[in-house]
Amino acid sequence: MSHRQSCDRCRQQKVRCLRDESQGGAGNKARASFSRCERCTKASVDCVYSLKSRSNRPNAHQPIHNQVDADPQTLVGPSWFGQGLFCQAASGSLGPDYDDLAGQFADLDGAEFNGWDGNLDVIPSLSMSSLNTLAAPAAMVSQDISPTKDHHDNNHMQEPEADDDDESNNGHDQDAIQELSLQLTAISQRATRAKRRLHRAGCPPPTVSSPEVNEAFEDTNNLLRIANNITNACAHLCDEASSNSITLDYGLVFSALASHQHLLALFKAICHLIQRYLESMTSANQHRQQQQQRLHDGDIGPSSVAQFVMVLQLLTYLINRMDRNLAQVNGPHGHGLETSLGGQATPITPSTGYQDIVQSMLIHRGDKNNTTGSSQSLPIIGQVVLGAIPDEHKRLRQVIQELQTRIERSEIQ
């Protein structure tokens, strides 16, 4: 008799039952397999047989969710935990230890005990209809939250987009203003450095290809371009009366005027350098030897004089362009305006100098003893500078004409 068909006592002792299997013939073979064991009879104990282990073949009526994906070959072990809980949950596959446990209850039907786990629905199966039923409330909630075309909050939802557009436009304007401010600052710095180089001793004679002359030409073009952008922005601001229009940064106006003043100072330095070389060429006979040495060192000759003429013509061209673009503060008669402390505007004639205007303004202020304080001195000086721009251009053109006349009358051609 095999070990699986032995009684519980013999199986625990790991021996085979000694039974008379011939009793009852072949028809009583099933009953004979559960006959009393000779070992139990000799020991005067009850012979208990456990239920047989059913095959691991799954039952057709078993729910799919009761089958576990674990491999029974890797999980089967001597313990009830490995054989019963984690074994493949086929119908009746509770493991031999569960069979031993069931054998202690003689009045329990084996078929019903082996099939209890296969018919028990621990987790009820869900059909697609039930899933759709559960998902329906969530869809209804999402539909209630989503706005419709007639929803009263549409205007509120569109307001952040308008704010984003305004912020992007303001950011773009600030970047453009910063870029123009940096360009104007660079123009002033380059003009100041070039003017200092021209005032140094031993500076070569200026030509149309000199770095200082090239910087004067390029920076003047850049300044006029920036000035046109500022005036166009101001005209656009005046045309639009809307409160959403972009405010003009007036700091750019003062920066442009400062760059204009530095370029005028550079023009004057170039004219002064040409005047020095012309004076060295027309010195008296007693300094002829020293003059020849200077001519040799500075390469002064007819070619240099021709370069002087071209440089002066270039300066005249640049000043005329400034007149057309920057000197628009003058009135219809072509004169600037001087604003006194009393608020009265008096015309500035071309014969009136800039320093005379400032000096008379300061004297007038000291005599009047105005109580407004020094906070108005800078704006008043700024107004004087603006009114003197046409006069500054005219006096610079007069200096250039004098130099051109001197070159024409000189003996070195």
UniProtKB/Swiss-Prot annotation:
Pfam short name (any one): Zn_clus
GO cellular component: nucleus
Location in the cell: Nucleus
Keywords from the named record: DNA-binding, Metal-binding, Nucleus, Transcription, Transcription regulation, Zinc
Compositional bias (Basic and acidic residues): 147-159
MF annotations from Gene Ontology: DNA binding; DNA-binding transcription factor activity, RNA polymerase II-specific; zinc ion binding
Gene3D superfamilies assigned to the protein according to its UniProt record, in alphabetical order: Zn(2)-C6 fungal-type DNA-binding domain (4.10.240.10)
Top-level taxon of origin: Eukaryota
Region of interest (Disordered), ranges: 145-173
DNA-binding residue intervals: 7-47
PROSITE patterns attached to this UniProt entry: ZN2_CY6_FUNGAL_2
Induction remarks: The fujikurins gene cluster is specifically expressed during rice infection.
InterPro entries tied to this protein: Zn2-C6_fun-type_DNA-bd_sf (IPR036864), Zn2Cys6_DnaBD (IPR001138)
Physiological role: Transcription factor that regulates the expression of the gene cluster that mediates the biosynthesis of fujikurins.
Name recorded for this polypeptide: Fujikurins biosynthesis cluster transcription factor FFUJ_12243
